[in-house]
Amino acid sequence: MGNSTSLFQRLVNTFIIAMQEPNKLTKETMLKIAIDKQYVNVVEYLIRKRVNIVNCRNSYNPLISAIETENEEIVNLLILNGASVNELSHTNNTPLHVAVDKNIKP
């Protein structure tokens, strides 16, 4: 029984690490896909599993992606869980710049 628990823990840990890795073809992380598809429950799950929500690989900024989808619930989830509102994108824009560019009103 102890062996199966250990195996289970290793599988879970491997899965958590894999969640951070971008897809080899699309270069997108699970978080990026969930944000783009606006799967709030998946974003919540990934946050609970402590995936990186600040700045991911390939200069991808999850908060900026959420702002671009105009999904206020995901934007709030990310901010409440530590996403930086000052983190720059690969084009040197902050999330506020992106919101203004999209003409998003408070």
Swiss-Prot record:
ANK repeats lie at residues 26-55, 58-87. The keyword ATP-binding does not apply. SUPFAM superfamilies: Ankyrin repeat. InterPro entries: Ankyrin_rpt (IPR002110), Ankyrin_rpt-contain_sf (IPR036770). Keywords: ANK repeat, Repeat. PANTHER family: ANKYRIN REPEAT AND PROTEIN KINASE DOMAIN-CONTAINING PROTEIN (PTHR24198), ANKYRIN REPEAT-CONTAINING PROTEIN-RELATED (PTHR24198:SF165). This is Putative ankyrin repeat protein FPV241. It comes from Fowlpox virus (strain NVSL). The lineage of its organism: Viruses, Varidnaviria, Bamfordvirae, Nucleocytoviricota, Pokkesviricetes.
